[in-house]
UniProtKB/Swiss-Prot annotation:
The chain crosses the membrane at residues 18-38, 174-194. One of its GO terms (biological process) is capsule polysaccharide biosynthetic process. This is Probable capsular polysaccharide biosynthesis protein YwqC. Pathway: Capsule biogenesis; capsule polysaccharide biosynthesis. The lineage of its organism: Bacteria, Bacillati, Bacillota, Bacilli, Bacillales. It is a multi-pass membrane protein. Keywords: Capsule biogenesis/degradation, Cell membrane, Exopolysaccharide synthesis, Membrane, Transmembrane, Transmembrane helix. Its main location: membrane. It is found in: Cell membrane.
Length: 248
């Protein structure tokens, strides 16, 4: 019985505040869309791939130990690619107006497990700049690794290219709108229940019975002011007339 009453109160609150819920949800959804399309700067991503292969020598066959060694080196290479030794040279070569740390924040270096392929991904507000940075990093790394580690086992597998109509990786307007809708709906429902909780006026017999734990014997209807005034004047005139007859 308590559960049904509670559910009834919940539905009653939602119904009573439905306009508030709709307005807040719509406003949040619209704000999410406007921010996604007009306020946030699009970010583009481009990637290049390098291959860590066996050392270049006169042997044509690939030894298992060579592959294992290259796989172990990949983690080291991932760190070196994002080090100032490489990034400072990239900044100098491209004439970028940023620090090596700022450039580092734009770069993601990854590789699949047991794969000799390393992916270098760069994010930037300009798709062409992202591609240029990725390709320059790969080129500089290929040149520098021979002197840094005295090895020559890196080759560029594929270069970053810019499509005719590049798509930004962020923001994602549809996702942002969906999140804004969900947040607006949840927030508006929470606000509705908060307002209902702060409203301590008694609006029904059921509320009064629940609050005082006593039965309601009857109710007094609300009398309109005009009717109340008319009845008051009518009663006053009747009393006056009665008083006059009594005096006679």
């Amino acid at each position: 019985m308590g559960e049904s009453t509670s559910l009834k109160e919940i539905l009653s609150t939602l119904t009573k505040r439905i306009l508030l819920i709709m307005i807040v949800t719509a406003a949040a959804t619209a704000a999410g869309g406007l921010i996604s399309f007009f306020a946030l700067t699009p970010i583009y991503e481009n990637s290049t791939q390098i291959l860590v292969n066996q050392s270049k020598n006169e042997r044509k066959e690939v030894q298992f130990n060579d592959v294992q060694t290259n796989l172990q080196l990949i983690n080291t290479y991932n760190v070196i690619i994002k080090s100032p030794a490489i990034l400072d040279e990239v900044i100098k070569e491209m004439g970028l107006s940023m620090t090596s740390q700022e450039l580092n924040d734009k770069i993601t270096v990854s590789s699949e497990q047991d794969s000799q392929v390393v992916n270098i991904s760069v994010r930037d507000e300009n798709a062409e700049t992202a591609a240029h940075i990725a390709n320059t990093i790969a080129s500089v790394f290929q040149d520098k690794i021979t002197s840094i580690m005295n090895v020559d086992n890196v080759s560029i597998l594929s270069k970053a290219e810019v499509s005719e109509h590049p798509s930004p990786v962020s923001p994602k307007p549809l996702l942002n709108i969906a999140i804004a809708f969900a947040a607006g709906l949840a927030g508006s429902i929470g606000l509705a229940f908060l307002l209902e909780h702060l409203d301590n006026t008694i609006k029904s017999e059921e509320q009064l019975e629940s609050l005082l734990d006593i039965p309601v014997l009857g109710t007094v209807s609300t009398i309109a002011n005009e009717q109340k005034t008319a009845k008051t004047l009518q009663g006053f005139q009747s009393e006056k007339t009665g008083s006059g007859h009594f005096g006679a």
